[in-house]
């Protein structure tokens, strides 16, 4: 179950990985309320996916870490897993579909992940 302590722990684990991003008001999307958008597109990988990938990988045991990680994704999750694994010294393999955006494939390769298409 998700607890406030787990949220604080995740924030601590992610403090040097995830950028603090702003909330910007979205008046055109707000009707009868104030709506804000979180600018997670400004994360190092271009999306919020790095948060979940890094946190999960940070919680692996030594035995699990020694085995490496495998992920399947067309882009954002792939980059999050590759970044997290590389920063934690864990081998990663990312399976990407044929037709995945070239930019996403190249960015994932640049994060030192082995790519299978």
Question: Which sequence ranges carry the predicted segments?
Answer:
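PLP-dependent amino-acid enzyme catalytic core
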Residues: 1-115
């Amino acid at each position: 179950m998700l607890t406030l302590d787990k949220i604080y722990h995740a924030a601590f684990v992610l403090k040097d990985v995830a950028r603090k991003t702003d909330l910007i008001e979205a008046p055109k999307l707000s009707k009868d309320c104030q709506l804000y958008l979180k600018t997670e597109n400004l994360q190092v990988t271009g999306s919020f996916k790095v948060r979940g990938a890094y946190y999960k990988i940070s919680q692996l045991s030594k035995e699990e870490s020694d085995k490496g990680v495998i992920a399947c994704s067309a882009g954002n999750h792939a980059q999050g897993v590759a970044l997290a694994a590389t920063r934690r010294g864990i081998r990663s393999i990312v399976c990407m579909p044929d037709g995945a955006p070239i930019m996403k494939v190249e960015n994932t390769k640049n994060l030192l992940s082995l790519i299978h298409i």
